[in-house]
Amino acid sequence: MTSSLSLHSSFVPSFADLSDRGLISKNSPTSVSISKVPTWEKKQISNRNSFKLNCVMEKSVDGQTHSTVNNTTDSLNTMNIKEEASVSTLLVNLDNKFDPFDAMSTPLYQTATFKQPSAIENGPYDYTRSGNPTRDALESLLAKLDKADRAFCFTSGMAALSAVTHLIKNGEEIVAGDDVYGGSDRLLSQVVPRSGVVVKRVNTTKLDEVAAAIGPQTKLVWLESPTNPRQQISDIRKISEMAHAQGALVLVDNSIMSPVLSRPLELGADIVMHSATKFIAGHSDVMAGVLAVKGEKLAKEVYFLQNSEGSGLAPFDCWLCLRGIKTMALRIEKQQENARKIAMYLSSHPRVKKVYYAGLPDHPGHHLHFSQAKGAGSVFSFITGSVALSKHLVETTKYFSIAVSFGSVKSLISMPCFMSHASIPAEVREARGLTEDLVRISAGIEDVDDLISDLDIAFKTFPL
């Protein structure tokens, strides 16, 4: 990296003119050039050309200044450098190799097609369905965050999950968790079987059930941890070992956690899905999905499906995600802290029967969760034992918007059995322990005291 500062007569008055007017010393420099050329190594800065100060001056640098420069160089030479920046730093320091002008905001390449160099030669891009610089910038960043070989952005989380199911052929099997997002459940129970794929549903928190379900025909194991909405925790490491022993891939829907809190690929998963609509974009203004994958062979298969099916994310939607993702770590930190305090308040409330949140010490999966994630996130649920009370809470609060989805800066509240999970038959929901009085909360970035007070008023206004 080289930066320079030069004074040219075409831009400023000559030094002679300034000197004649008494505005500058006769011994002032006629040219100033500063060149900074750091050579980075794994853990420290090399002392060779690590800091070069080049001044062309009539007056030589005095001994004190020379000593200061040497001391600065020595300090830089011995400074320990982290092997990798933290997520919050990576998010705002995107290496945008797609922009020749180094704009601070990644450019939006709002185009459907690209001019080619000749009739028989192709440029780096030809048609946005197949690739676009704005999408590539987002995918490159997401791959880095998830420690993936490649990442791919889709028009929604469900489009991303649908692409994964197309990796499985007629007669092969998918083993999937029984407590998953309602849209995923609909895809697995009503759409995937049409192609001749066998779907087995198990409680992924019970390793013996998972082991019994995985067989020679199993090609994919699909799980969420924590699950949506009941916050059940599965052992991603051990399930990955079981699946790989049979030659199956492992998919983890990591939408509730995001790359800030969990990296399932490092735990053994092969594919990680994010609904980028949620924490990645963070503002409820765009739909998007992500698949982050390990291995070039798998990456090529996923790209083939994305390109062939036309499910790649549009440039403007990619740009919105790039804008939102810069504050993801900051948002999640605040949202998670709010969720923890609200969950603690609810867990001690006499009208609440149970709170499902892995961040609470008495959660049965608490220790397992924190062995594979950095935090519990900001989505949780609770039951009251009364559908009427739950309905009153959802409808009476003024700072929680009644809406599906989660991960927005705005706090959201819902009753999953009537909203996000309504497509699951009632008898199936009941068998899985998904009761109609269940309330799901996605904590936003508001003042937590206002949110707790809002809930408290709602409880107090419900007739006994």
Swiss-Prot record:
Q: In which pathway does it act?
A: Amino-acid biosynthesis; L-methionine biosynthesis via de novo pathway; L-homocysteine from L-cystathionine: step 1/1
Cofactor(s) needed for function: pyridoxal 5'-phosphate
Source domain of life is Eukaryota
Keyword annotations from UniProtKB, A to Z? Amino-acid biosynthesis, Chloroplast, Lyase, Methionine biosynthesis, Plastid, Pyridoxal phosphate, Transit peptide
SUPFAM superfamilies, alphabetized: PLP-dependent transferases
Q: Per the record, what are the reactions this protein catalyses?
A: L,L-cystathionine + H2O = L-homocysteine + pyruvate + NH4(+); an S-substituted L-cysteine + H2O = a thiol + pyruvate + NH4(+)
Location(s), subcellular: Plastid, Chloroplast
Mention any Pfam family matching this sequence.
Cys_Met_Meta_PP
For the biological process aspect of GO, one term held by this record is: L-methionine biosynthetic process from L-homoserine via cystathionine
| Reported consequences of knocking out the gene | Decreased abundance of several PIN-FORMED (PIN) proteins, involved in plant auxin transport, and impaired auxin-responsive gene expression.
Among NCBIfam families, the record links this protein to: cysta_beta_ly_E
| The protein's name in its UniProt record | Cystathionine beta-lyase, chloroplastic
